[in-house]
Amino acid sequence: MGKRIISQNRGKGTPTYRAPSHRYRADIKHIKFSGDLVRGIVEDIMHDPARTAPVALVRLENGEKQYVLATEGTYIGQEIACGPAAEIQPGNTLPLASIPEGMPICNIESKPGHGGQFARASGVYGILVAHDVGATVVQLPSGEMKWLNPNCLATIGVVAGGGRTEKPLVKAGKSFYKYRSKAVKWPRVRGVAMNAVDHPFGGGGRQHPGRPKTVSRGTPPGRKVGSIAARRTGKR
């Protein structure tokens, strides 16, 4: 009898496969404001294991502290503002209705009050394309055009940490630490490279599945590997 395969262990949710969320800084949201404006001072810029971009610790006028996404050019001691009356400069957060067309923006809300869902990875940004009646057109980093509520908040500028993907990992140790901060088991071993006890495709004198790779939708756990409920296989 074989052992439980990796997909079964992942489904159970053992510590090996859980995201280390206890190490994450905070859930990054936009600064809440009452009225037209709230200001704050950037006290620190630090790494967050939860994301690829650096985060900035901001002390607000009322003494509270909050983490926000750092934009390119952010520095310690910088004053940032949030609200409809904020200045049009990188790092400030305004409703889409208050931002001029053609401006690069990041940390864009999908709905008012949701805190920011689009363009949050390092080095990315969206473009505010046009203002329409009751809607604002924003081009996302993927190129998709999105019609959003003009009251949705967005931060002006480009998310800091650009060029991250241009630096090669070079060695496996770097990749190990990269994936350690995520809910990903790394390295990922192929089933045909395993022993027969570890995977349905394992074992044998050479690396081949030894059986059809297609399985039905109702296949029990431990055997449900390969092309699941495939309509077709092979090259098109």
Curated annotation (Swiss-Prot):
GO BP annotation list: cytoplasmic translation
Top-level taxonomic group: Archaea
GO CC annotations on file: cytosolic large ribosomal subunit
PROSITE patterns: RIBOSOMAL_L2
Sorted UniProt keywords: Ribonucleoprotein, Ribosomal protein, RNA-binding, rRNA-binding
Keyword Ribonucleoprotein: yes
GO molecular function: rRNA binding; structural constituent of ribosome
Region of interest (Disordered), ranges: 198-236
SUPFAM superfamilies reported in the protein's UniProt record: Nucleic acid-binding proteins, Translation proteins SH3-like domain
HAMAP family the record matches: Ribosomal_uL2_A (MF_01320_A)
NCBIfam families from the UniProt entry: PRK09612.1
Family: Belongs to the universal ribosomal protein uL2 family.
Function: One of the primary rRNA binding proteins. Required for association of the 30S and 50S subunits to form the 70S ribosome, for tRNA binding and peptide bond formation. It has been suggested to have peptidyltransferase activity; this is somewhat controversial. Makes several contacts with the 16S rRNA in the 70S ribosome.
Complex formation: Part of the 50S ribosomal subunit. Forms a bridge to the 30S subunit in the 70S ribosome.
UniProt protein name: Large ribosomal subunit protein uL2
